[in-house]
Regions:
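Active-site region of glycoside hydrolase catalytic domains
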Residues: 3-37, 85-87, 97-471
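Short, cationic motifs built from Arg/Lys/His that form the positively charged side of catalytic pockets
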Residues: 74-76, 81, 451-454
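Catalytic domains of carbohydrate-active enzymes, especially glycoside hydrolases
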Residues: 53-78, 113, 290, 294-295
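Generic structural signal for well-ordered secondary structure
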Residues: 58, 93-96, 100
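Glycine-rich, proline-tolerant flexible connector loops at the mouths of alpha/beta enzymes
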Residues: 77-92
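Aromatic- and Gly/Pro-rich amphipathic surface segment
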Residues: 22-63
Length: 471
């Protein structure tokens, strides 16, 4: 699997067209900076209303990707476009099904394979009861993620879990004959408020996996995608730093991966910090085990990890500790005094050596083929550059080529089953509040909506094709 990825809420626009109901990001965009307590919306923010108008321009976009030799096209479908009233038994938006029928068929016609994310950071607004006061999860408040996607919520006495499974079944039933790769959730830990949120995600995923494989006899593969700015110990010779990195990675990954891939309980890193976690019974674990066909990870960058000033245990026991929930110190400076890598516009640093180590860690821990379903690099200050300078994005090329090169070493020298990579993202788009963090391998003129290829797109494709084994 070698392809590109994007999410509906970041590219489609058309937020009120053809039956789509609001999602939390739409409504957050209406909030003033004064109403938003420490979240994504500021006085300088831009909403997602238009994005890059992919909903209308999808054929043009697919043509451009196919012309470059892309093999897999990862996209998402908004729940509220398929089911505007979100609940089981409410009307299905046939116009939306027709739209995605046309999109999927066009992807196939152009020689690519569609790969579908069912939920990518676009929670139906109905679950919030008209109140987004608690949308953002402030540090030191006992929450887990950054933004509450209401996985633990209910609407009209129907849980998010049950409503999401109903939506997923509708989409799978309609498109399973043409889509070979599926994901249930994107980076759910970042959107989880508490232990009940985690429980709802894991069980909803397992139910949809069983539906896909057991009930409709789907022949493709399904997973959910996890995130982890992979933690590396500040000093690999210091046991305390090693333990802190292990704690950090375990919390982010094993919380989901232990039950789903190994059929075992949540890790102690999670249970010691999240007091309201929902215990998993033996029956739960038997049902959840084996419900993902590959390990889907989005390892954009490494982060340097060390213990907190007190202890991990003390932090875990203190609900208001500012380092919760991970209870470690994260930084970008190594013991040499140097940055861990070349810096981007955001949190991403170019850290390819650690990428190889991380692939080994994932493979050796969970013994499941690993797919990198997002990785990308927003070049520093690209927003301020001329069009021609934006197109000549050598740091992004270096990022992709160096990571893929280390991935090949992991395959051929280490024996890791590294089975796929999806570049994030195929065009500059809405980055949850603004357009200044440019992850794209194409530029977008937001007045004319013209797309132009960047150098990194050619370099990404050339790297892959020049090393592709002939069948």
């Amino acid at each position: 699997m070698l392809g590109v990825a994007a999410a509906a809420v970041q590219i489609e626009g058309a937020i009120a067209d053809e039956g789509r109901a609001p999602v939390h990001n739409d409504v957050a965009g209406l909030a003033s900076a004064a109403q938003n307590v420490g979240g994504l919306v500021t006085a300088d923010s831009s909403p997602d209303y238009i994005a890059i108008e992919n909903y209308y321009l999808f054929k043009q976009d697919i043509e451009r990707l196919a012309a470059m030799g892309v093999k897999y096209y990862r996209f998402s479908i908004p729940w509220t476009r398929i089911l505007p009233f979100i609940l089981p038994g409410t009307p299905v938006n046939e116009q939306a099904l027709s739209h995605y029928d046309e999109l999927i068929n066009f992807v196939l016609e152009k020689g690519m394979q569609p790969a579908l994310m069912l939920y990518h950071n676009d929670a139906p607004f109905q679950f919030y009861g008209g109140n987004l006061t608690n949308l953002f999860i402030a540090p030191g408040t006992g929450g887990i993620g950054y933004l509450d996607s209401c996985f633990q919520c209910s609407y009209k006495n129907v849980s998010f879990e049950d409503a999401f499974v109903n939506y997923g079944k509708i989409v799978m039933t309609h498109f399973a004959d043409r889509i070979p790769i599926w994901w249930s959730f994107n980076e759910p830990i970042l959107a989880s408020r508490n232990g009940r949120s985690i429980n709802a995600v894991i069980k909803a995923h397992a139910r949809l996996s069983h539906f896909y494989h057991d009930e409709i006899k789907g022949t493709g593969r399904i997973s959910l995608t996890l995130n982890d700015n992979f933690g590396v110990p500040r000093n690999p010779q210091d046991p305390a730093d090693v333990d802190a990195a292990d704690h950090f990675n375990s919390f982010q990954l094993a919380t989901f991966a232990n039950p789903i891939f190994l059929g075992i309980d949540y890790p102690e890193s999670f249970k010691s910090s999240i007091s309201d976690y929902v215990p998993l019974t033996a029956e739960d674990l038997a049902y959840i085990n084996g419900t993902a066909d590959f390990f889907s990870i989005q390892p954009y960058t490494a982060t340097v990890v060390s213990p907190p000033n007190d202890t991990i245990a003390a932090c875990s026991a203190n609900i208001s500790h500012p380092l919760r929930p991970y209870c470690v110190t994260q930084q970008t400076i190594t013991t040499t005094g140097w940055n861990i890598g070349y810096r981007s516009q955001s949190y991403v640093y170019i850290t390819p050596t650690y990428f190889r180590t991380y692939l080994n860690y994932l493979w050796n821990t969970w013994k499941t083929p690993v797919a990198v379903t997002e990785f990308g690099f927003p070049v520093f200050a690209e927003q301020e550059k001329s069009q021609r300078d934006q197109e000549f994005d050598s740091p992004r090329s270096q990022y992709y080529q160096s990571y893929l090169n280390e991935g090949l070493k992991a395959i051929w020298e280490d024996g890791v089953k590294f089975v796929g990579a999806f570049a994030w993202t195929w065009a500059d788009n809405w980055e949850f509040g603004d357009y200044s963090q440019k992850f794209g391998i194409q530029t977008v003129n937001r007045t004319t909506m013209e797309r132009r290829y960047k150098k990194s797109f050619f370099d990404y494709v050339d790297f892959v094709e020049s090393r592709r084994q002939k069948s």
